[in-house]
A protein has these predicted regions:
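FAD-binding core of flavoproteins
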Residues: 1-61, 65, 75, 170
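Short, hydrophobic/aliphatic alpha-helical segments
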Residues: 36, 123-136
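Extended, low-aromatic, Leu/Ala- and acidic/polar-enriched alpha-helical coiled-coil segments
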Residues: 43, 50, 81-91, 120-123, ...
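C-terminal helix-coil-helix/basic helical segment that borders enzyme active sites and/or dimer interfaces
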Residues: 64, 68-78, 91-125, 138-141, ...
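A glycine-biased, small/acidic residue-tolerant capping/turn segment at secondary-structure junctions
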Residues: 106, 114, 130-156
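Glycine-rich phosphate/cofactor-binding loops in nucleotide/flavin-utilizing enzymes
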Residues: 141-182
Length: 182
């Protein structure tokens, strides 16, 4: 059953009612399903983190362009120190997220022992940074940021949906701590 999510992604619902599988239908070794599922979800999560990184970067670029072009009180709004500080904070969070995504992607590619921990770190950082970049963008754009005329509102929706996909930031911080035995 097909659906369109709030962030314009396509989604589907698969219903398996009354399905029975015989012993010959088992994929992989019996009892090894959880480890395989963890690996698949880690791979999917790091791919999502890459998409989130691209989205937050684009939201930030749109916001920077708006700061450079929007006039208020006879000057560009990007000249206001308070907005410069907000932009610098978003930039820092995006770069931290970028480093985490790159480390997680390398760990997934290498089949590293700390793969799951690095993936959870990346997802937690990306969730927080993407929501921050989108929220700050909407705040800086003002009311027009919520209209369909400006893409920043789309990135806010995408940030919220991506944040919840494969576990939110709190889930991944808890997973990171559990894996690290904290």
């Amino acid at each position: 059953e097909g659906q369109t999510r709030v962030d314009h992604r396509n989604a589907g619902i698969v219903r398996l009612d009354g399905v029975e599988c015989g012993a010959g239908a088992i994929l992989g070794a019996p009892g090894a399903g959880a480890a395989l599922l963890d690996e698949v979800v880690d791979r999917a999560t790091v791919v999502l983190c890459g998409e989130m990184l691209g989205g937050m970067s684009q939201a930030f670029d749109l916001t920077l362009e708006y700061l450079k072009t929007r006039d208020q009180f006879g000057v560009k709004i990007g000249s206001f120190q308070g907005l410069q500080h907000r932009a610098a904070n978003v930039f820092m969070e995006i770069e931290l997220a970028r480093s985490c995504v790159m480390a997680a992607a390398r760990a997934v590619d290498a089949g590293a022992k700390d793969r799951s921990k690095l993936v959870s770190l990346a997802k937690a950082r990306c969730s927080d940074a993407y929501v921050l970049a989108a929220n700050e963008g909407v705040q800086i754009f003002g009311g027009v940021g919520m209209t369909d005329e400006y893409d920043i509102g789309f990135y806010m929706k995408r940030a919220r949906a991506s944040e919840l996909t494969f576990g939110d930031a709190a889930f991944h911080r808890n997973r990171w701590a559990t894996i690290g035995k904290y």
